Amino acid sequence: MKKRALVSVSDKTGVVEFVKGLLEQGIEVISTGGTKKLLEENGLQVIGISEVTGFPEIMDGRVKTLHPNIHGGLLAVRDNETHVAQMNELGMEPIDFVVVNLYPFKETIAKPDVTFADAIENIDIGGPTMIRSAAKNHKFVSVIVDPVDYDVVLAELKENGEVAEETKRKLAAKVFRHTAAYDALISNYLTEQMGEESPETLTVTFEKKQDLRYGENPHQKATFYKAPFAATSSVAYAEQLHGKELSYNNINDADAALSIVKEFTEPAVVAVKHMNPCGVGVGTDIHEAYTRAYEADPVSIFGGIIAANREIDKATAEKLHEIFLEIIIAPSFSKEALEVLQSKKNLRLLTVNIEKATSASKKLTSVQGGLLVQEEDTLSLDESTISIPTKREPSEQEWKDLKLAWKVVKHVKSNAIVLAKDDMTIGVGAGQMNRVGSAKIAITQAGEKAQGSALASDAFFPMPDTVEEAAKAGITAIIQPGGSIRDEDSIKVADTYGIAMVFTGVRHFKH
């Protein structure tokens, strides 16, 4: 008995050549709708689906393969005598190959003007049913959902006259990944349409972007996956112009740097090490901003990641070229800047659209045995809701420094303290188990520059000791959430030393 293949694809990449290869192997091809038309236009002889089902395609193609003659041919266990007898009795023929990919639901809902009706119409029913049937019976049926696998299948057919059992299993596994991802997209779309924020089950799907050399450490394996609708202003959508392949740590650090630089509308440069900012500078142009970011911590920036929110020009590139850096991220690089920076063969240069998120996306954090889901912390300082509990209010320059420090401190590992002065950070205290410890680190780093600077804290002061340390260092303004039962103690110390203090009412823990 001749082997049969059923071919019905939305993505027609390579399908003509593949079907030609099947026909050359003596395999009959059944096809539907647009796929059948394309194959026939290319001179290939195929059988219409209606000839197999004895039933016309109806309801604008919604019902064409949902028929016992199709699914009996797919699901029949060929070495089961009862199955074979029933097939013979009902005049069914086995189907040995299924070549199907699904309606473009993802592409449809990605359109800015998509309607709900359009989205629903692009939910495939017959396709998933066929490929799931075929994948379940993969011992006897080869099922191909990805054009990438066409050459593998044809090569095995030409060499061995059949597809290897291991290949069939791999193809079947791909089918169930494919349908799971497809259903997750549909589930998430409908859930969002209904405004459900915490559904009883969470379905997520990610697409493989690249294998990584290793993970956080050389003994850990790692892979980079991107969300199907990831923001274009993300590392997942960055274009690499030059340099070595990105590592696991590179991607983490680049993501952190991007998150910080998006906080600024004026020209800004951020330097990051181990996902914490070591220097942030703003200026009238990107060269001035970089100079300040570098001067913020010229030691820690070595081997760091740089993110800028303006094009890198030649003058800035020449300064960047002077030190060892892992990555430079910017919206663009001038031709002259590229010529300067590409002389370092390992330096990774990335371009990405840099724009602050207008709405909070979901942040997923894995824990042992589960997953935490929360909104990203995209909240900006709202000056209409702040309060100033101290006798003195910040000066204009202090306000400027406070705002810069507050934008940065939300991106520093808690407990976090950031000092800023004259359009740059001058001290960063990160990840300490007590707040005053982080303050001491930031103050020590700032040295004499701490005099007249502004301090930001990601959470309230449980005791007045941090304010006391700030006063000793000559810090003149503080911004913090407030809300401690001992706020009055901190306010009293601030007033004693003439420090202006701002309460935001918003905490920015980061773990």
From Swiss-Prot:
Domain notes: The IMP cyclohydrolase activity resides in the N-terminal region.
Keyword rRNA-binding: no
Pathway: Purine metabolism; IMP biosynthesis via de novo pathway; 5-formamido-1-(5-phospho-D-ribosyl)imidazole-4-carboxamide from 5-amino-1-(5-phospho-D-ribosyl)imidazole-4-carboxamide (10-formyl THF route): step 1/1; Purine metabolism; IMP biosynthesis via de novo pathway; IMP from 5-formamido-1-(5-phospho-D-ribosyl)imidazole-4-carboxamide: step 1/1
Gene Ontology cellular component terms for the protein in this record: cytosol
Any single Pfam family the record assigns to this protein: MGS
An example Gene Ontology biological process: 'de novo' IMP biosynthetic process
Entry's Gene Ontology molecular function annotations: IMP cyclohydrolase activity; phosphoribosylaminoimidazolecarboxamide formyltransferase activity
Catalyzed chemical reaction(s): (6R)-10-formyltetrahydrofolate + 5-amino-1-(5-phospho-beta-D-ribosyl)imidazole-4-carboxamide = 5-formamido-1-(5-phospho-D-ribosyl)imidazole-4-carboxamide + (6S)-5,6,7,8-tetrahydrofolate; IMP + H2O = 5-formamido-1-(5-phospho-D-ribosyl)imidazole-4-carboxamide
Keyword field contains Transferase: yes
Name assigned to this protein: Bifunctional purine biosynthesis protein PurH
Family matches, as InterPro entries: AICAR_Tfase_dup_dom_sf (IPR024051), Cytidine_deaminase-like (IPR016193), MGS-like_dom (IPR011607), MGS-like_dom_sf (IPR036914), PurH-like (IPR002695)
Domain MGS-like, first and last residues per copy: 1-145
Documented EC number(s): 2.1.2.3, 3.5.4.10
Keywords, sorted A to Z: Hydrolase, Multifunctional enzyme, Purine biosynthesis, Transferase
Membership in a protein family: Belongs to the PurH family.
